[in-house]
Amino acid sequence: MKSKWMSGLLLVAVGFSFTQVMVHAGETANTEGKTFHIAARNQT
């Protein structure tokens, strides 16, 4: 039960992070590649 709850929470967190990155990239189209690269590097 707990592992299932943790998996769901992790999925929501990842989805939210991805949405935030996409919105930010859309707002700053000029630095889209740079923004995505920084975000990807911060994830690891």
UniProtKB/Swiss-Prot annotation:
The organism's place on the tree of life at top rank: Bacteria
Localization of this protein: Secreted; Cytoplasm
Effect of H37A: Restores reduced sporulation efficiency in a phrA deletion mutant
InterPro entries reported for this sequence: PhrA_inhibitor
Effect on the protein of changing A40E: Slightly inhibits both RapA and RapB
Description of how activity is regulated: Inhibition of RapA requires a free carboxylate group at the C-terminal end of the PhrA pentapeptide. A free C-terminal carboxylic acid PhrA pentapeptide inhibits RapA phosphatase activity at a 1:1 ratio and is approximately 200 fold more active than a C-terminal amide peptide.
GO biological process: sporulation resulting in formation of a cellular spore
Chain positions of site Cleavage: A39, A40
One cellular-component annotation, GO: extracellular region
UniProt main location, coarse: secreted
Residue span(s) of the pro-peptide: 1-39
Keyword Calcium attributed: no
Keywords assigned by UniProt, alphabetized: Cytoplasm, Secreted, Sporulation
Family to which this protein belongs: Belongs to the Phr family.
Subunit structure: Interacts with RapA and inhibits its interaction with Spo0F.
Function description: Signaling molecule involved in the regulation of sporulation. Secreted during production, but the mature peptide acts intracellularly, indicating that it needs to be imported into the cell to function. Inhibitor of the RapA phosphatase activity. Does not act on RapB.
Protein name as it appears in the record: Phosphatase RapA inhibitor
Gene responsible for this protein: phrA
